[in-house]
Amino acid sequence: MKPEIIIMLTNNDITVKNAEEVFESCKDLPAKKWGFKDVGLPKDEMIKLAAKMKEAGKETYIEVVTYTEEGCLEGAKLAYECGFDYLTGALPFDSVFEYAKEHNLKYSPFCGKVGGSPVELTGSIDEIVSSAKECIEKGADGVDLTAYRYADGDPIELTKAIVDAIG
C-alpha cells in the first residue's frame, strides 16, 4: 500500500472560513485528495468548493463528525448533494452503507469507539482492529482512523496494527 495524504481544510473539527482561498492558493500541489468537514461553511459554499476541487482534478472528501444514525445518514445525504467522491467519518450504520452504495459514494467510516468534539478514539487495539475489519466486511472502502486522538494507548502501535489487519 502506498500511503497518500488527504489535505483537510479544517481546524478543530470545523472547516476553516477561508477554505476556498486556501485551496486556490494550494491547488497546484501534487496532493490529489482534498476535503473538509460538514460544519463551518454554508451548503452552497460546500457545493462550490467541492466543484472547484474536482475541476482541479482532485478527489473530494467530506468528513462527518456525528454519532447518531440520523445525523450520520444526513451527513451521507449532504456528501451526495454536494458532489463529494468520498464520505469519511460517521459511524458504520447499515443505513449509511446502503445510502452510500445506492448513490455511488465511497465510504470510510470511523472505526473503534469514537465520541466527543474534537473526536476522541478509545478502546483496546484489538477492539479497534476488530471494528475496522467489520467495516471492511460491510463494504467500506477504507476506515477513518483517528489515531492521533487515540486516548488508550500508542497511536503508532495502533496504526501499524490497522495497516497489518486491513492493508
Regions found by a protein language model. Give the residues of each.
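Alpha/beta enzyme core
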Residues: 2-60, 65-167
